[in-house]
């Protein structure tokens, strides 16, 4: 079986969150979606399960983190700097926040961080591995 990751995120408005994630480039998998949850596909190995609070409670009784706090930031590699900028623009246009952290311009890597409507953090980045500076072994 292929190794996959399913990131489970509690959301306050499932329809708003579905529209938000579609705008970022995720596709909805209807086979694993209903009126309490939606499976949003980033790639063959990466999925975001957006869950109503009631559905989330079927998995855990742990409290929801307050908006504006974070325990993880999920980062997605994109094909270009323009794609990074487009993802942040889409986040802003669909109820999220763009540039929640300072933009990073490192020459070989460009990143901008965003938040979904519930405050979950996502990093969008582009990197040119051939341009990564290498330490002098001597």
Residues covered by each model-derived region:
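Short secondary-structure capping/turn micro-motifs that flank functional sites
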Residues: 36-38, 57, 107-108, 135
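Vicinal oxygen chelate
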Residues: 4-12, 40-41, 62-138
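N-terminal beta-strand motif that seeds the catalytic metal site of vicinal oxygen chelate
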Residues: 1-18, 73-76, 127-138
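A short, acidic/glycine-rich surface segment
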Residues: 55-62, 131-134
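Short, hinge-like loop/turn segments at secondary-structure boundaries
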Residues: 47-48, 67, 118
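Core segments of cupin and vicinal oxygen chelate
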Residues: 8-56
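Hydrophobic pocket/interface hotspot
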Residues: 17, 21, 84, 91
């Amino acid at each position: 079986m292929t190794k996959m990751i399913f990131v489970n995120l509690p959301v306050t408005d499932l329809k708003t969150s579905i529209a938000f994630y579609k705008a970022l480039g995720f596709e909805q998998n209807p086979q694993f979606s209903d009126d309490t949850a939606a499976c949003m596909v980033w790639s063959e190995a990466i999925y975001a399960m957006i869950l109503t609070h009631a559905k989330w409670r079927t998995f855990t009784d742990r409290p929801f983190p307050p908006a504006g706090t974070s325990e993880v930031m999920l980062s997605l590699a994109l094909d270009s700097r323009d794609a990074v900028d487009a993802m942040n623009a889409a986040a802003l246009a669909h109820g999220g926040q763009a540039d929640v952290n300072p933009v990073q311009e490192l020459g070989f890597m460009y990143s901008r961080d965003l938040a979904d409507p519930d405050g979950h953090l996502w990093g969008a980045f582009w990197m040119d591995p051939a341009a990564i500076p290498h330490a002098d072994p001597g």
